[in-house]
């Protein structure tokens, strides 16, 4: 095979030392000469391996606290030289440049420094310069050079070398080069994103998003679509950080819905009591607080028992046995919680297809972050919706002010409405949703659909009155006309929370007063598309 290239010399310079010694020993057994830098060389020597310092190769000492060590023609010439170009070979001979056939580099842990909240100066010091330069050089010259940037590829490298008597194929080197360029692109994207945040640059001239492959999937949102899941390095608690205890591999839709459920349940402080969210197609179909987690689940389930079948459940407290027992009474796709006790896990173990995820923590709903949406030819970027209101932010605009009980439910409903696809209408009573209207083009239609579903559920539960009787209503945006408010009143609602800001606010307020409703304005909108 003419594309086989033997490996005779390797340069190793790694921050992550895991697997390093096994790799180096195997390379030594294959009679590969080892060159290394600083701490990597010290680790290899301590293990009894023969290694040349890069300073010996360059004839120049490491300097400036290690900032300058591999940025030298003796290194980059060895990586970039074309082995079949006579001029390159003459230049190498003239300057004593030795070819480097294998580069093993993993970069300074910049992303980890950012994740732990390191200072600005510390983050700057964790930006690798020499590593990316060598990686890009080796990847560019992959016709002749192997470049390994991920410890997960050590085994594949050794398997390749052993299969070809110490050489590698072009196809293998191309695969490594792709991984290498992906790594340097992601690294630069992480630095750029961090600096944009640190310098409070709202709209940098260029924006790059990067991720690390976590999972390939059988298909995407639909069976004809290919899909994969990538983590972004932010370590925000959720699906990306969760431990899966049991069940089948998560699907594209599972991940999308589970994220929606967990972000909503995180809005409810666990120190203020248990809360449960049930989601279907990224929309909540039941949300409730309770004296116990099991009660919270039961109340959320009673909002829409039909839609809850095959849904996603998110809890704001660790799963306990009593709640686990209730959940197993119907088919559920995924349960996500900060934790799960041993007895609860044992109960779930009997349901092999039920996926259980634990995260150890809840995401901070007020934390800054970015959200983006792809459009033809570009993408939209905005701050994550971290909007929040409390009782002091509300403006009473009707003759009647809400009671304390109504006020508590209004704030609960407003929190839920933030996570419902627009146009969103949410009915709440006693700390539980009793009707959710989502995704309608007309706000009055969302109001009526939520009320009708509530009536259907009341009949199924054998109740004489609809669940919305005596409830409060949240609307994610203003009522453009009074019709939506009147539909809510007709369904039995007694109080309304909405942003306000319509040119017909006066008409809507007058209609609320005539119906005896209390209404408050938040001054904040929560469109969700």
Curated annotation (Swiss-Prot):
Residues 2-149 form the MGS-like domain. One of its GO terms (cellular component) is cytosol. Pathway: Purine metabolism; IMP biosynthesis via de novo pathway; 5-formamido-1-(5-phospho-D-ribosyl)imidazole-4-carboxamide from 5-amino-1-(5-phospho-D-ribosyl)imidazole-4-carboxamide (10-formyl THF route): step 1/1; Purine metabolism; IMP biosynthesis via de novo pathway; IMP from 5-formamido-1-(5-phospho-D-ribosyl)imidazole-4-carboxamide: step 1/1. GO terms for molecular function: IMP cyclohydrolase activity; phosphoribosylaminoimidazolecarboxamide formyltransferase activity. Its EC number is 2.1.2.3, 3.5.4.10. PANTHER family: BIFUNCTIONAL PURINE BIOSYNTHESIS PROTEIN ATIC, BIFUNCTIONAL PURINE BIOSYNTHESIS PROTEIN PURH. This is Bifunctional purine biosynthesis protein PurH. The lineage of its organism: Bacteria, Pseudomonadati, Pseudomonadota, Alphaproteobacteria, Rhodobacterales.
